[in-house]
């Protein structure tokens, strides 16, 4: 099978997903959307993964249930607040009733990232548990949620890429033109979701990286920040924001660069300073 044939096959798969109905099913007057399901299954996977992986940390069920609840709240509040303030403040100032209508879309990954860290830190402090090993668990579970979320963006026909003449170019009806564009949602799903999920799972399972608390969480932050900055060059900027500067710098890059820098710095610092643990670790604060 030639490279061109593979390219066209990938495009056909993307187009098939793109033309799915954003509403998965109706239950009476209630619409169940693919986007909502991406959150549900991402949360369920995170709960399963964290519960299973936490056995080596001797974390009790009460703590884990509290952790999942507040992590989800932190992601939603952080993601929604950041989107409102950074991406579309004038719209929500004019239509404040839309603030609570999250099913209409409008979430920021960067806000969700910060919100989750804050929520996890608060829960850990309350239960007198060290933060970094718990964030490591969250970091290994997060990529699947990112993968599902980006694929749901594709179903919604949103966050599409810039114009391209390559064989991967797809026409997005929501763009308002017939110009083939990069399926940037798929790029992000693979590079921010599937690839780090596989890579970090291998590291956590088959290497001693997991014994150095903080390495996995800082690695995820560095990975996401770098990849997001790169993929933004293929993604059309949000129309209500446009380019921030230089005719190419986007809001996504402005927010991702600090995450990458801090992640790299903390990763190096952790590798140099954190001593590996053996067996069931005591992570009491």
UniProtKB/Swiss-Prot annotation:
Keywords: Cell inner membrane, Cell membrane, Membrane, Transferase, Transmembrane, Transmembrane helix. The keyword Transmembrane helix applies. It is a multi-pass membrane protein. One of its GO terms (cellular component) is plasma membrane. GO terms for biological process: lipoprotein biosynthetic process. A 1,2-diacyl-sn-glycero-3-phospho-(1'-sn-glycerol) binds at residue 150. Pathway: Protein modification; lipoprotein biosynthesis (diacylglyceryl transfer). Its EC number is 2.5.1.145. It holds the Pfam family LGT. Catalyzes the transfer of the diacylglyceryl group from phosphatidylglycerol to the sulfhydryl group of the N-terminal cysteine of a prolipoprotein, the first step in the formation of mature lipoproteins. This is Phosphatidylglycerol--prolipoprotein diacylglyceryl transferase. It comes from Anaplasma marginale (strain Florida). The lineage of its organism: Bacteria, Pseudomonadati, Pseudomonadota, Alphaproteobacteria, Rickettsiales.
């Amino acid at each position: 099978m030639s490279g061109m044939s593979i390219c066209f096959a990938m495009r056909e798969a993307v187009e098939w997903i793109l033309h799915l109905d954003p509403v998965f099913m109706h239950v009476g007057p209630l619409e169940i959307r693919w986007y909502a399901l991406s959150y549900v299954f991402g949360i369920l996977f995170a709960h399963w993964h964290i519960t299973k992986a936490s056995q080596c940390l001797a974390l009790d069920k009460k703590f884990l249930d509290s952790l999942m609840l507040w992590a989800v709240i932190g992601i939603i509040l952080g993601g929604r607040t950041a989107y409102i303030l950074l991406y579309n403040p004038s719209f929500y100032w004019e239509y404040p009733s839309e603030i609570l209508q999250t099913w209409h879309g409008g979430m920021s990954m960067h806000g969700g990232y910060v919100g989750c860290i804050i929520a996890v830190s608060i829960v850990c402090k309350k239960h007198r548990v060290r933060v970094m090993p718990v964030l490591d668990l969250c970091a290994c579970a997060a990529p699947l949620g990112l993968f599902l979320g980006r694929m749901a963006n594709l179903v919604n026909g949103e966050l599409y890429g810039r114009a391209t003449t390559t064989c991967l170019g797809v026409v997005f009806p929501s763009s308002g033109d017939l110009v083939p564009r990069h399926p940037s949602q798929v790029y992000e799903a693979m590079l921010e979701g599937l690839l780090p999920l596989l890579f970090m799972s291998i590291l956590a399972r088959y290497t001693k990286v997991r014994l150095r608390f903080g390495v996995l969480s800082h690695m995820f932050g560095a990975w996401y920040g770098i990849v997001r900055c790169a993929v933004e060059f293929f993604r059309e900027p949000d129309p209500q924001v446009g380019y921030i500067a230089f005719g190419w710098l986007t809001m996504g890059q402005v927010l991702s660069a600090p995450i990458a820098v801090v992640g790299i710095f903390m990763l190096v610092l952790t590798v140099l300073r954190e001593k590996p643990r053996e067996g069931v670790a005591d992570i009491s604060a």
